[in-house]
Amino acid sequence: MQSFNTIGLIGRLASASTQYSLKRLIAFLTDQKLEVLLDKETSTILPDCDLPVATRPELAQACDLIIVVGGDGSLLSAARAFAGHDVQILGINRGRLGFLTDISPEDIENKVGEVLSGRYLLEQRFLLESTLLRDDEVMSTGLALNDVVIHPGKLIRMIEFELYIDDEFVYRQRSDGLIISSPTGSTAYALSGGGPIMHPNLDAVVLVPLYPHTLSSRPIVVGGNSEIRLIVCENNNLNPLVTCDGQSQTMTQPGDTVFITKSEKRLKLIHPEGHNFYETCRSKLGWASHTGN
């Protein structure tokens, strides 16, 4: 396993618990005589810290390990910044569910120490890439580790769009939107929308309709290399939004085309040794664990 020499730290902002965990982590890493860099935004919640400060592009170039202290949202933001770079990501959970940030705050020294000694599992997660075209001109692009969603925004009104997969017409739909999710995102918003749980190793994408105005529209699982194309219908009375991971969004206009494909970029995600996807599902989703009669 790769050894780590330069470690970047990113923390969830406006969180006292994150501050506490970051201070513990910094003390532990400096005791190990490792070079530690602090994310520029994160430095605002640690004003007394004397670590070198770096922007995320600078962290991507200088570090071989990024440790994110926060929730899944913090890790999603880091994923888009560091995917495609030769840097690995480790998460410490200071959020709510913590599907991606799977080290407990109580185990920081123990579990991070195991990772530093080479005892960890490495996964390569693919991201989705969205491209918005208007009159054959690229208006915006976006990356998502979890999902790309087309939706009406703040207004409680249905939108209408056409769906094509690999240039084949699938349907024209009126609904509250559509979730296009990676396997990583299948335990997030897509799950709430009634989509299936997909193992992270699957090379697949799931499309989950949001409250479709039909009784027969169900989630569709397609191959990971599929090209998904959405056409915003002309008769929409609003401007649907396209959102990546619930964190970045762009506004569409009637007649726009949105392409969603698998990105060439990969996220190198680290888990502690012994990590088990199904155990994570049991603990995070409240599945029964009793196997006796």
Swiss-Prot record:
It catalyses: NAD(+) + ATP = ADP + NADP(+) + H(+). Keywords: ATP-binding, Cytoplasm, Kinase, NAD, NADP, Nucleotide-binding, Transferase. One of its GO terms (cellular component) is cytoplasm. GO terms for molecular function: ATP binding; metal ion binding; NAD binding; NAD+ kinase activity. PANTHER family: NAD KINASE. One of its GO terms (biological process) is NADP biosynthetic process. The active site is at residue 72. InterPro entries: ATP-NAD_kinase_N (IPR017438), ATP-NAD_kinase_PpnK-typ_C (IPR017437), NAD/diacylglycerol_kinase_sf (IPR016064), NADK (IPR002504). The lineage of its organism: Bacteria, Pseudomonadati, Pseudomonadota, Gammaproteobacteria, Cellvibrionales. Belongs to the NAD kinase family. Its EC number is 2.7.1.23. It comes from the Bacteria. It is found in: Cytoplasm. The keyword Transferase applies. Gene3D superfamilies: Probable inorganic polyphosphate/atp-NAD kinase, domain 1, Probable inorganic polyphosphate/atp-NAD kinase, domain 2. This is NAD kinase. Involved in the regulation of the intracellular balance of NAD and NADP, and is a key enzyme in the biosynthesis of NADP. Catalyzes specifically the phosphorylation on 2'-hydroxyl of the adenosine moiety of NAD to yield NADP. Its cofactor is a divalent metal cation. The gene is nadK. The keyword S-adenosyl-L-methionine does not apply. NAD(+) binds at residues 72-73, 146-147, 157, 174, 176, 187-192, 247.
